[in-house]
Amino acid sequence: MKLEHPDRLMNRTPLSLAALETHDAFAERHIGPDAASQQAMLDTLGFATRAALIDAVIPASIRRAETLPLGPFAQPKSEAEALAALRALADKNQVFRSYIGQGYYNTHTPAVILRNVLENPAWYTAYTPYQPEISQGRLEALLNFQQMVADLTGLEISNASLLDEATAAAEAMTLLQRVGKPQSNVFYVADDVLPQTLEVIKTRAKPIGIEVKSGPAADAAAANAFGVLLQYPGANGDVRDYRALADAIHAAGGHVVVAADILALTVLMPPGEWGADVAVGNTQRFGVPMGFGGPHAAYMAVRDEFKRQMPGRLVGVTVDAQGKPALRLALQTREQHIRREKATSNVCTAQALLAIMASMYAVYHGPRGLKTIALRVNRIAALLAAGIRHLGYATVNDTFFDTLTIDTGARTAQLHAFAQAKRINLRRAGDTRVGVSVDETTTRADLADLLTIFAQAAGATAPDIDALDAGLLPAPALPPSLERTSAYLTHHVFNRHHSETEMLRYLRSLSDKDLALDRSMIPLGSCTMKLNATSEMLPVTWPEFGRIHPFAPAEQTVGYREMIDQLEQMLVAATGYAAVSLQPNAGSQGEYAGLLIIHAYHESRGESHRDVCLIPASAHGTNPASAHMAGMKVVVVACDAQGNVDIADLKAKADAHSHDLAAIMITYPSTHGVFEQNVREICEIVHAHGGQVYVDGANMNAMVGLTAPGQFGGDVSHLNLHKTFCIPHGGGGPGVGPVAVGPHLAKFLPNQRSTGYARGEDGIGAVSAAPYGSASILPISWMYIAMMGAKNLTAATETAILNANYIAKRLAPHYPVLYSGPGGLVAHECILDLRPIKDSSGITVDDVAKRLMDYGFHAPTMSFPVPGTLMVEPTESESQEELDRFIAAMIAIRDEIRAVEEGRADREDNPLRHAPHTAAVVTANEWPHAYSREQAAFPVASLVANKYWPPVGRADNAYGDRNLFCSCVPVSDYA
């Protein structure tokens, strides 16, 4: 049956109320092509219906027999209905004043940053800045982040964010293992490190043979450790002078990692000045809500000698084709997409959007404002200490920045009861102690309430705050020897945007430089840059989600946990597995968790020797990097000429490693953009040799509602909620990478013993700092699924496949489509082969990518999985009009290439070799090129009315790596 145009329905009268109700309205907003457009594209492909196309694309042997079993969410909700339902869940949460601390603090998000960064699609819909010429705004914001972290830590170089403080500490551990003394496998963790950090470190250390020892910091130098982790200030609030200890550790051949509070570093001597080799931490308290644990931007800073070992993205300064400063991602050869199992880390997505928020918090407040905030926090803590001592309590720590640990003896339970009555959470530090951490939001009234609670428990009257303040010596809590004397944030960017007017204009100037989904489609293969709907994003800013501490009592988080349970069941339905954990806070971490689960399963069966992981040659680089981190040996399986797993080679490798085979990691549909016909056979071969099947869920957008990895042989998968389920990419994070497993693996799902979170009774431990990972962005995916319902989620998948095949069909006469399935069809993406073009014209895939910028497009994925190709994924959200605009651009570029091939254009002086063209170049007095200015800037007529100008010319990557500079650029350099 052909799709019926909705206008025809409107001509039928009378229409019932049921016919006029708009439960499907959101799906019509989310799916780009309307019925008429879809039919036109189907006609181009030679299919009468979408169903007929899908039958031809997906092997019948793996098709889902039943409708997506979403239970109460099977029927779509309107945007208003979904928001109301989620509001009802949010209202079940109780927003208490939280003084739990432990790395999470209340903070004020400046409204100008909330509205113009977090709520601005120009920022949150952007992709990781692999194409630097159209990413200069967010690259500058991330460079500000790096400068901020380097300044505050006192170390030479910082990366552009990591996932959370605990995983950053684990990354520091493995960094120091690579550079440390080879005779030691011991990593020593001081006993006042945050408990969630220690737990993640233990999880990360076990599979790679690192022995974690924990004890008093004073014993660290004698531990013969390659690295030592110190907390500054400590978990109990104590501020210790570690200078002599750091010297002793270095003398013993070890290195020092310091987990440092970013706000405290505005008033405390930075770790880089007293011996730290690496500093890690969290920037959450720089304007990012707690959000029940995330997302937040962690940081890592290192000494210059370790810069090539540092994980994560690194923004560096280079020059463009005109010799002007330009920013780019530096030292990319460290990363998993290039070095695979030899990479420094498996991290792809980090926390770019949150890093940008934190950096803008520093820009807005400046060094003076930040120090004022820190001094006020410290003063409130000092007044609290004076008051409770006046009431007869003793503090465990005499020195502190913002945290007190208090001996409360038999009054402890009563204190917590009094606090609960005032809707206050104190930290439960054992049966006889209470912890209190104050923050930027703590007011005089809050301090009075805290003193009243302690006074009630003591049977006394709370002391007067003004009297305490008048009698308190300046800064009594910080050791004078550790007072910060060095300057920080001296660069002009941190000292000029302090009025809201200036800040607003600065943010606008940066966002105008970038190309995000709010301007045009981003056809990146394997990235699924679909719509991030406004209604999905709205709940992220609700205080009922944002102001919840991850370690708050369970009775205060009922709504959160109910929403999370519902989302887990939605994902179970989509994947065909039995259970899901949402703890992994990136796809890379979901991969890693899945492999640890496989290892735990084998171990439980007395087969811990199984450590070989088969990985197809076409796999994304995170797969081998994750396998290496999980302690597995990577064995590569060949692919055939069509890009499919070579079954003969798979059988040979499985036979050769049968005794030790742990798993195979496959991506489905494959990284070549095809539904492999023999995926069931692949799974059966591995199972026959005792292995487990890991199905990478990066391409889940081609499967939802049509097939499911848990039904065709998969044992475990990770998903990317920031791809398939609409969490935005944020310019390089946040992401969520849930791990989904079959029933036999459910008991091994991640848990967190330090907080009592037990998802699996034999769980692998914690893989992120918070029990539910990046919990505050989970409502985005909940909203998407609730508003789509089963039928429309399936329709979205079908439309994504339709759009990809339409592009492949239209572009095939101009660019060979490298891989396809039966009938010449592809899955949800297609690979265009540009290698013959390079041979005939000298034009490279890089030239085409840069030229697309002149046409107003972000390039498709370059040279993955095959060098010299472009991988195009349009998603279901792009209209036929936008697809046609992209197709027209690609055809026009092919004509420009043909001019070079035929000698009508010079092989060097042509629009592709000099792309992208900036406004400054096009309007300069001199025009040295054989082609016209109009051809350079306006190659198609549509650009005259709506033109995006790349802010810089082509970035010189080699120059940037040869002359590595990863700090803010002086204003004079832009002159």
From Swiss-Prot:
GO terms for cellular component: cytosol; glycine cleavage complex. Pfam families: GcvP2_C, GDC-P. InterPro entries: GcvP, GDC-P_C, GDC-P_N, GDC_P, PyrdxlP-dep_Trfase, PyrdxlP-dep_Trfase_major, PyrdxlP-dep_Trfase_small. It catalyses: N(6)-[(R)-lipoyl]-L-lysyl-[glycine-cleavage complex H protein] + glycine + H(+) = N(6)-[(R)-S(8)-aminomethyldihydrolipoyl]-L-lysyl-[glycine-cleavage complex H protein] + CO2. Coiled coil: none annotated. The keyword Amino-acid biosynthesis does not apply. Its EC number is 1.4.4.2. It is an enzyme of class 1 (oxidoreductase). The keyword rRNA-binding does not apply. Transmembrane segments: none annotated. The glycine cleavage system catalyzes the degradation of glycine. The P protein binds the alpha-amino group of glycine through its pyridoxal phosphate cofactor; CO(2) is released and the remaining methylamine moiety is then transferred to the lipoamide cofactor of the H protein. The glycine cleavage system is composed of four proteins: P, T, L and H. Belongs to the GcvP family. This is Glycine dehydrogenase (decarboxylating). It comes from Burkholderia pseudomallei (strain 668). The lineage of its organism: Bacteria, Pseudomonadati, Pseudomonadota, Betaproteobacteria, Burkholderiales.
